[in-house]
Protein backbone atom coordinates (compact mmCIF):
# COMPACT_ATOMS: atom_id res chain seq x y z
CA UNK A 1 0.00 0.00 0.00
CA UNK A 2 1.26 3.43 -0.94
CA UNK A 3 -1.10 6.18 0.13
CA UNK A 4 -4.46 5.52 -1.47
CA UNK A 5 -3.12 2.99 -4.00
CA UNK A 6 -3.50 -0.77 -3.69
CA UNK A 7 -2.55 -3.82 -5.76
CA UNK A 8 -4.78 -6.84 -6.21
CA UNK A 9 -5.01 -10.00 -8.28
CA UNK A 10 -8.24 -10.87 -10.02
CA UNK A 11 -8.83 -14.40 -11.24
CA UNK A 12 -11.26 -14.75 -14.12
CA UNK A 13 -11.96 -17.25 -16.84
CA UNK A 14 -10.15 -16.85 -20.14
CA UNK A 15 -13.29 -17.13 -22.26
CA UNK A 16 -13.53 -19.30 -25.36
CA UNK A 17 -10.59 -21.70 -25.74
CA UNK A 18 -9.51 -23.36 -28.95
CA UNK A 19 -7.93 -26.75 -28.22
CA UNK A 20 -5.87 -28.67 -30.79
CA UNK A 21 -4.70 -32.14 -29.75
CA UNK A 22 -2.27 -34.64 -31.35
CA UNK A 23 -2.78 -38.21 -32.45
CA UNK A 24 -0.16 -39.97 -30.34
CA UNK A 25 -1.89 -39.70 -26.93
CA UNK A 26 -5.41 -38.67 -27.97
CA UNK A 27 -7.50 -39.29 -24.83
CA UNK A 28 -4.71 -38.10 -22.52
CA UNK A 29 -4.29 -34.84 -24.41
CA UNK A 30 -8.02 -34.18 -24.74
CA UNK A 31 -8.65 -34.57 -21.01
CA UNK A 32 -5.51 -32.59 -20.14
CA UNK A 33 -6.91 -29.60 -22.03
CA UNK A 34 -10.66 -29.92 -21.50
CA UNK A 35 -10.49 -30.57 -17.74
CA UNK A 36 -8.63 -27.37 -16.73
CA UNK A 37 -10.69 -25.28 -19.16
CA UNK A 38 -13.93 -26.54 -17.63
CA UNK A 39 -12.63 -26.05 -14.10
CA UNK A 40 -11.75 -22.44 -14.91
CA UNK A 41 -15.24 -21.78 -16.28
CA UNK A 42 -14.29 -21.59 -19.95
CA UNK A 43 -16.15 -22.77 -23.01
CA UNK A 44 -14.15 -24.52 -25.69
CA UNK A 45 -13.86 -25.79 -29.25
CA UNK A 46 -11.81 -28.99 -29.61
CA UNK A 47 -10.10 -29.98 -32.85
CA UNK A 48 -8.47 -33.41 -32.52
CA UNK A 49 -5.94 -34.75 -34.98
CA UNK A 50 -7.56 -35.87 -38.21
CA UNK A 51 -5.53 -39.09 -37.89
CA UNK A 52 -7.19 -40.02 -34.57
CA UNK A 53 -10.74 -38.56 -34.54
CA UNK A 54 -12.67 -41.43 -32.94
CA UNK A 55 -11.36 -40.84 -29.42
CA UNK A 56 -12.66 -37.28 -29.52
CA UNK A 57 -16.06 -38.39 -30.84
CA UNK A 58 -16.40 -40.88 -27.98
CA UNK A 59 -15.28 -38.19 -25.54
CA UNK A 60 -17.93 -35.81 -26.91
CA UNK A 61 -20.59 -38.48 -26.42
CA UNK A 62 -19.48 -38.92 -22.81
CA UNK A 63 -19.64 -35.17 -22.25
CA UNK A 64 -23.18 -35.06 -23.61
CA UNK A 65 -24.29 -38.03 -21.50
CA UNK A 66 -22.78 -36.34 -18.44
CA UNK A 67 -25.08 -33.36 -18.95
CA UNK A 68 -22.61 -30.77 -20.19
CA UNK A 69 -24.67 -27.70 -21.16
CA UNK A 70 -24.98 -27.09 -24.91
CA UNK A 71 -22.26 -24.81 -26.23
CA UNK A 72 -19.80 -25.40 -23.40
CA UNK A 73 -17.92 -28.24 -25.11
CA UNK A 74 -17.80 -28.19 -28.90
CA UNK A 75 -16.08 -30.64 -31.25
CA UNK A 76 -15.01 -29.81 -34.80
CA UNK A 77 -13.15 -32.43 -36.83
CA UNK A 78 -10.84 -31.51 -39.68
CA UNK A 79 -7.22 -30.91 -40.59
CA UNK A 80 -4.83 -28.20 -39.46
CA UNK A 81 -4.71 -26.04 -42.60
CA UNK A 82 -8.51 -25.63 -42.54
CA UNK A 83 -10.01 -26.07 -39.05
CA UNK A 84 -6.78 -25.33 -37.18
CA UNK A 85 -6.22 -22.07 -39.02
CA UNK A 86 -9.89 -21.11 -38.66
CA UNK A 87 -9.71 -21.54 -34.88
CA UNK A 88 -6.39 -19.75 -34.48
CA UNK A 89 -7.47 -16.75 -36.52
CA UNK A 90 -11.08 -16.49 -35.32
CA UNK A 91 -11.77 -13.23 -33.45
CA UNK A 92 -14.16 -14.90 -30.99
CA UNK A 93 -11.54 -17.40 -29.76
CA UNK A 94 -9.74 -15.93 -26.75
CA UNK A 95 -7.02 -18.53 -26.24
CA UNK A 96 -5.35 -21.33 -28.19
CA UNK A 97 -3.85 -24.43 -26.59
CA UNK A 98 -1.86 -26.57 -29.02
CA UNK A 99 0.13 -29.79 -28.71
CA UNK A 100 1.88 -31.12 -31.79
CA UNK A 101 4.68 -30.46 -34.24
CA UNK A 102 6.86 -27.37 -34.22
CA UNK A 103 5.82 -26.63 -37.81
CA UNK A 104 2.12 -26.57 -36.93
CA UNK A 105 2.85 -24.68 -33.71
CA UNK A 106 4.44 -21.87 -35.69
CA UNK A 107 1.27 -21.61 -37.77
CA UNK A 108 -0.92 -21.48 -34.65
CA UNK A 109 1.24 -18.71 -33.17
CA UNK A 110 1.23 -16.69 -36.38
CA UNK A 111 -2.53 -16.95 -36.92
CA UNK A 112 -3.25 -16.18 -33.25
CA UNK A 113 -1.03 -13.10 -33.27
CA UNK A 114 -3.42 -11.23 -35.56
CA UNK A 115 -6.03 -11.07 -32.78
CA UNK A 116 -3.46 -11.09 -29.93
CA UNK A 117 -4.71 -14.35 -28.43
CA UNK A 118 -3.11 -15.98 -25.44
CA UNK A 119 -1.31 -19.10 -26.72
CA UNK A 120 0.11 -22.12 -24.89
CA UNK A 121 2.04 -24.77 -26.79
CA UNK A 122 3.77 -28.09 -26.24
CA UNK A 123 5.85 -28.85 -29.31
CA UNK A 124 7.73 -31.93 -30.46
CA UNK A 125 11.38 -32.53 -29.71
CA UNK A 126 14.12 -35.05 -29.04
CA UNK A 127 14.39 -36.23 -25.44
CA UNK A 128 17.87 -37.07 -24.15
CA UNK A 129 18.77 -39.22 -21.16
CA UNK A 130 22.14 -38.48 -19.55
CA UNK A 131 23.61 -41.63 -18.02
CA UNK A 132 26.56 -40.92 -15.75
CA UNK A 133 29.60 -43.05 -15.00
CA UNK A 134 28.32 -44.37 -11.67
CA UNK A 135 24.87 -45.40 -12.96
CA UNK A 136 23.70 -49.00 -13.24
CA UNK A 137 24.23 -49.22 -17.01
CA UNK A 138 22.51 -52.57 -17.46
CA UNK A 139 19.36 -51.35 -15.74
CA UNK A 140 19.26 -47.77 -17.04
CA UNK A 141 20.02 -48.48 -20.68
CA UNK A 142 17.73 -51.50 -20.97
CA UNK A 143 14.92 -49.52 -19.32
CA UNK A 144 15.41 -46.55 -21.64
CA UNK A 145 15.55 -48.75 -24.73
CA UNK A 146 12.18 -50.24 -23.85
CA UNK A 147 10.92 -46.75 -22.96
CA UNK A 148 11.99 -45.44 -26.34
CA UNK A 149 9.81 -48.05 -28.05
CA UNK A 150 6.75 -47.47 -25.84
CA UNK A 151 3.76 -46.30 -27.89
CA UNK A 152 5.84 -47.33 -30.92
CA UNK A 153 8.25 -44.51 -30.13
CA UNK A 154 5.53 -41.96 -30.88
CA UNK A 155 5.89 -39.88 -27.73
CA UNK A 156 7.41 -36.44 -27.21
CA UNK A 157 9.14 -37.78 -24.09
CA UNK A 158 10.51 -40.97 -25.66
CA UNK A 159 14.20 -41.24 -24.66
CA UNK A 160 15.40 -41.37 -28.25
CA UNK A 161 18.90 -40.19 -27.32
CA UNK A 162 21.22 -41.59 -24.65
CA UNK A 163 24.29 -39.59 -23.68
CA UNK A 164 26.91 -41.77 -21.98
CA UNK A 165 30.60 -41.40 -21.09
CA UNK A 166 32.74 -41.99 -24.18
CA UNK A 167 34.75 -44.62 -22.32
CA UNK A 168 31.62 -46.76 -21.88
CA UNK A 169 29.94 -46.12 -25.21
CA UNK A 170 30.67 -49.59 -26.60
CA UNK A 171 29.24 -51.20 -23.46
CA UNK A 172 26.13 -49.01 -23.65
CA UNK A 173 25.62 -49.81 -27.34
CA UNK A 174 25.76 -53.55 -26.66
CA UNK A 175 23.22 -53.32 -23.83
CA UNK A 176 20.87 -51.25 -26.00
CA UNK A 177 21.27 -53.65 -28.92
CA UNK A 178 20.44 -56.67 -26.78
CA UNK A 179 17.42 -54.93 -25.25
CA UNK A 180 16.06 -53.80 -28.62
CA UNK A 181 16.33 -57.30 -30.06
CA UNK A 182 14.09 -58.61 -27.26
CA UNK A 183 11.22 -56.27 -28.20
CA UNK A 184 8.45 -58.16 -29.99
CA UNK A 185 6.85 -56.23 -32.86
CA UNK A 186 3.50 -57.30 -34.24
CA UNK A 187 -0.27 -57.34 -33.81
CA UNK A 188 -1.26 -55.23 -30.77
CA UNK A 189 -4.02 -57.77 -30.02
CA UNK A 190 -1.34 -60.38 -29.31
CA UNK A 191 -0.41 -60.34 -25.61
CA UNK A 192 3.23 -61.06 -26.46
CA UNK A 193 3.51 -57.96 -28.65
CA UNK A 194 5.38 -55.02 -27.15
CA UNK A 195 5.39 -52.70 -30.18
CA UNK A 196 2.65 -52.26 -32.77
CA UNK A 197 2.59 -50.33 -36.04
CA UNK A 198 3.15 -46.62 -36.58
CA UNK A 199 0.08 -44.45 -36.97
CA UNK A 200 0.20 -43.77 -40.72
CA UNK A 201 2.03 -44.27 -43.99
CA UNK A 202 3.44 -40.75 -43.66
CA UNK A 203 5.03 -41.59 -40.31
CA UNK A 204 6.28 -44.94 -41.59
CA UNK A 205 8.00 -43.35 -44.57
CA UNK A 206 9.45 -40.60 -42.38
CA UNK A 207 10.95 -43.09 -39.92
CA UNK A 208 12.32 -45.28 -42.71
CA UNK A 209 13.96 -42.23 -44.27
CA UNK A 210 15.52 -41.22 -40.95
CA UNK A 211 16.95 -44.69 -40.41
CA UNK A 212 18.47 -44.62 -43.90
CA UNK A 213 19.78 -41.12 -43.22
CA UNK A 214 21.54 -42.35 -40.09
CA UNK A 215 23.24 -45.08 -42.10
CA UNK A 216 24.18 -42.71 -44.93
CA UNK A 217 25.65 -40.12 -42.56
CA UNK A 218 27.95 -42.65 -40.93
CA UNK A 219 26.30 -43.65 -37.65
CA UNK A 220 26.94 -47.25 -36.57
CA UNK A 221 23.82 -49.39 -36.95
CA UNK A 222 23.81 -51.74 -33.96
CA UNK A 223 20.49 -53.44 -34.74
CA UNK A 224 17.31 -52.90 -36.72
CA UNK A 225 17.50 -50.86 -39.89
CA UNK A 226 15.24 -50.11 -42.81
CA UNK A 227 12.35 -52.37 -43.76
CA UNK A 228 9.80 -54.26 -41.71
CA UNK A 229 10.65 -56.82 -39.02
CA UNK A 230 10.95 -60.45 -40.07
CA UNK A 231 7.56 -62.08 -40.60
CA UNK A 232 5.73 -58.81 -41.27
CA UNK A 233 5.35 -58.09 -44.97
CA UNK A 234 2.70 -55.37 -44.70
CA UNK A 235 1.59 -52.68 -42.28
CA UNK A 236 3.48 -49.74 -40.79
CA UNK A 237 5.78 -51.85 -38.64
CA UNK A 238 9.35 -50.71 -37.92
CA UNK A 239 12.31 -52.63 -36.57
CA UNK A 240 13.47 -51.44 -33.12
CA UNK A 241 16.64 -49.66 -34.23
CA UNK A 242 19.74 -48.61 -32.31
CA UNK A 243 22.57 -46.41 -33.61
CA UNK A 244 25.88 -45.63 -31.91
CA UNK A 245 28.71 -43.24 -32.81
CA UNK A 246 26.17 -40.52 -33.54
CA UNK A 247 27.42 -36.93 -33.70
CA UNK A 248 25.48 -33.69 -33.27
CA UNK A 249 25.79 -32.79 -36.94
CA UNK A 250 23.83 -35.88 -38.02
CA UNK A 251 20.14 -35.61 -38.88
CA UNK A 252 19.06 -38.26 -36.38
Would you name each region that the model predicts?
Residues 46-62, 75-82, 132-135:
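ATP-dependent adenylate-forming carboxylate-activation enzymes
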Residues 24, 31, 80-86, 100-107:
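Beta-loop-alpha module in the N-terminal Rossmann-like domain of NAD(P)-dependent dehydrogenases
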Amino acid sequence: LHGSSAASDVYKRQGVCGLITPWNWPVNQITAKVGPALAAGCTMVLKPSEIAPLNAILFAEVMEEAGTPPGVFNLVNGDGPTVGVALSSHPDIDMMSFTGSTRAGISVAQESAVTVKRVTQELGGKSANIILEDADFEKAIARDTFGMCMNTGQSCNAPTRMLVPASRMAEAAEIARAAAEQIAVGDPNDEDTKVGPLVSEVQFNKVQALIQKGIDEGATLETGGVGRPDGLDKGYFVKPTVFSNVSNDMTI
